[in-house]
């Protein structure tokens, strides 16, 4: 097994190598690379498959009790500063490696069919491999500096993939929005890392944690420095958390994620399941021993997660775009994870990260299958082929997609025995013990989750067939939706099986996941049937209420949705307009910045440019005047000399 650990650096290098080979081919041998397109895709899938085998081997080794492994080399060494790079493997790393590689390889297989007719097919696989390599590098990083490097690479890849169809104005705007929004969080993360280094003199997680503990006890001060106020330490930790707030789309930096749906559907699955948004939760998990020393920081994290969860769930209720509805669902579930971390439920938050990743990957790939099936009917217009109001009874045309999508929906809603039931139930239980007010928010969010997810399912696969108008399913034109091919369905079936089974590793009866991942042993407590039945009963009960309401409104049509919207007009408008957060940013930041930029332009043109232009004009005119002094006549020169001398003498006498 030592061989696997010594060569674990190959896990991110292999997909990175595949990306570089495609990139060089597109630059130097573009026509040949485009001709060999599926071969390059297969090559990338094989490389990622090897990385998956390595990852599974490491996970098995960690399960068998292999101690954490760290390989470091000194990169920069001076008298006062040293920086090491390398990789670190522990139970958390091993789980994340398998998660990222398994979801990524299924997305690649799916993309081979989904993107087959796209002109950027080869470029897409290059971006996809680079994206996966960046996340794998982040997971293996042993310190904050290395994490920050791969953190930025993940952000760059998301920019490229969200704007993959860059000729579309909406996609171009979306990738810029994602990039700028994440700059806010990344800048905070950068300042926080520098602040923690200033206090502790280290970028290593364990060293920072230990030294901060000593700083709080007054037993540690860096040579040449003074004792640090606790408030400053809190500020540094909050700045670090600003990075995960943006990357994991937490309120109020969540606005980029719904617009990220402008990218191809396979990358939406990867962003929302195993890579970009998971990076934020992963960093919070890595920083957990540090954050946990500051109750104010933990409380802030918990409340940010809870607010994000409830706001995103309310917004998701009124979304008609299939992918954007799932995007707000992702934001809400990420809020669950962050809230769990904030209340100290480390293992529950990580377990929900795993179960949600597979469930959400299944739902996004299922939505892509539906969109693919709708394209022959309504064309390639996203406003139609993603609009749930144009769908209905798709189950008759796409039975496999419908079944797998239903399994993903059941899981996300927390219906037993699906995966997310076990993780969500554990989060609710831990939250109830820590802060009952947050439990109420999380419990209501669970009901809303069930309602909007089954609303999606019923609008797409059940309900009325001709909801969008009789022209949608034109039998005479033979333009009915049809089931996707095997390359799309096989990943869906595999993810459906994983979604059904993966939750059993974290059941409260024998929580193998907690025993494996929880190195700090912070949450060990005996299992109690009464507690389990009360917590699970309340969460399943609210989920069933949401399911029933969605069925009555969108499947059986016994309740008029428009009447409810008219009755709850203020709340409906608030939800439909996304709590006006985008409007606030548009007015408060974009318009103000543009106005300031316009004023700066006017100042530059009229004042600064005016002064410079006047200086040039004055110089030219002075030269034009003075050139007549040089007339070649000696008499004129003598006159000037005498006149200047006379002026000088008179001036001297006067003074």
UniProtKB/Swiss-Prot annotation:
* GO cellular component, as recorded: chloroplast thylakoid membrane
The catalysed reaction is: a plastoquinone + NADH + (n+1) H(+)(in) = a plastoquinol + NAD(+) + n H(+)(out); a plastoquinone + NADPH + (n+1) H(+)(in) = a plastoquinol + NADP(+) + n H(+)(out)
Mind listing the UniProt keywords for this protein, alphabetically? Chloroplast, Membrane, NAD, NADP, Plastid, Plastoquinone, Quinone, Thylakoid, Translocase, Transmembrane, Transmembrane helix, Transport
Gene Ontology process terms (BP):
ATP synthesis coupled electron transport; electron transport coupled proton transport
Record-listed E.C. numbers:
7.1.1.-
Checking Gene3D superfamilies in the record gives: 1.20.5.2700
Q: Which Pfam family, giving just one, matches this sequence? A: Proton_antipo_M
| Membrane topology label | Multi-pass membrane protein
Using the UniProt record, name the top-level EC class of this enzyme in a single word. Answer: translocase
The main location class comes to plastid
Record-annotated membrane-spanning stretches = 7-27, 40-60, 89-109, 124-144, 147-167, 185-205, 226-246, 265-285, 296-316, 334-354, 361-381, 402-422, 434-454, 488-508, 533-553, 635-655
Query: InterPro entries attached here?
Result: NADH_UbQ_OxRdtase_chlpt_su5_C, NADHpl_OxRdtase_5_subgr, ND/Mrp_TM, NU5C-like, Proton_antipo_N
Q: Which NCBIfam families match?
A: NDH_I_L, PRK06590.1
> How would you summarize the oligomeric state and partners of this protein?
NDH is composed of at least 16 different subunits, 5 of which are encoded in the nucleus.
Q: What does this protein do?
A: NDH shuttles electrons from NAD(P)H:plastoquinone, via FMN and iron-sulfur (Fe-S) centers, to quinones in the photosynthetic chain and possibly in a chloroplast respiratory chain. The immediate electron acceptor for the enzyme in this species is believed to be plastoquinone. Couples the redox reaction to proton translocation, and thus conserves the redox energy in a proton gradient.
Family classification: Belongs to the complex I subunit 5 family.
What is this protein's record name?
Answer: NAD(P)H-quinone oxidoreductase subunit 5, chloroplastic
Q: Which gene encodes it?
A: ndhF
